[in-house]
A protein has these predicted regions:
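A surface-exposed partner-binding patch
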Residues: 1-110, 162-168, 176-205
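Helix-boundary capping/turn motifs
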Residues: 18-19, 121-124
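A broad, low-specificity signal marking well-ordered, structured residues that form hydrophobic/aromatic
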Residues: 102-103, 114-115, 128
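Intrinsically disordered, low-complexity regulatory segments enriched in Ser/Thr/Pro
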Residues: 123-134
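Compact, glycine/acidic-enriched structural inserts
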Residues: 132-159
């Protein structure tokens, strides 16, 4: 795969050390969703995969996969949640879009849903739509793709945080693939840090 400049920039501040190629069947994904996906998202799945950023945000799988301990979060469920939130907020009177144009790709620990607004026929031009839980606006469009949005969020480049949590504290940024996190849990370690955790694995089958 050709290296994606946005993902390369993101990797400079958030190493892919604990990421993994998700090995996505993109024709199958496109058949299910009825659309292609942005090049930066495709590249992210190939370099990082789905997983957690600092335990504060999760990047979702485009299609379901069985987990080692629990099923990892997927786009379909959170897309439904975002569309339901749109309806609950007043539908078109609150945010005048077709709800079918809302597709989720991530969530935060503050219960925000990170989405694309897919009204442009070119997926690489889809802006990020934040469906916020405790943000100034319930729906806010940001004129960046997924990778640039994450870069700006992780670099603290927003004057006002676009999400409901203090995402960046100036510390180390870490991405952990969902499969690695679940292995750590099974081994009695903290899924995010890998440090011993007496509670990790407590509810393992």
């Amino acid at each position: 795969m050709t290296e994606n400049a946005r993902i390369k920039a993101l990797e400079q501040i958030m190493p892919a050390t604990h990421g993994a190629d998700e090995d996505i069947d993109w024709p199958a994904v496109e058949a299910v969703w009825g659309t292609r996906f942005p090049a930066d998202f495709v590249a992210f799945m190939g370099r990082f995969g789905a997983g957690s950023i600092n335990g504060e945000a999760s990047i979702l799988l485009p299609l379901p996969k069985p987990g080692l301990q629990w099923d990892p979060a997927g786009m379909a469920e959170e897309t439904d949640n975002a569309r339901q939130a749109w309806e609950a907020e007043g539908g078109r009177s609150a945010f005048d879009v077709d709800p079918e144009s809302i597709i989720a790709w991530g969530v935060t620990g503050g219960s925000d849903i990170l989405c694309w607004l897919t009204t442009d026929p070119d997926p690489d031009r889809w802006p990020v739509l934040v469906c916020g839980r405790h943000t100034a606006d319930a729906f806010a469009v940001h004129p960046y793709g997924m990778a640039e949005f994450l870069y700006r969020l992780c670099s603290d480049e927003f004057d006002v945080s676009p999400v409901s949590i203090t995402f960046w504290d100036g510390g180390h940024l870490s991405f952990v693939h969902w499969r690695k996190a679940q292995r750590r849990w099974q081994e009695g370690r903290n899924p995010e840090t890998g440090e011993p955790d007496p509670y990790a694995g407590e509810f393992a089958d």
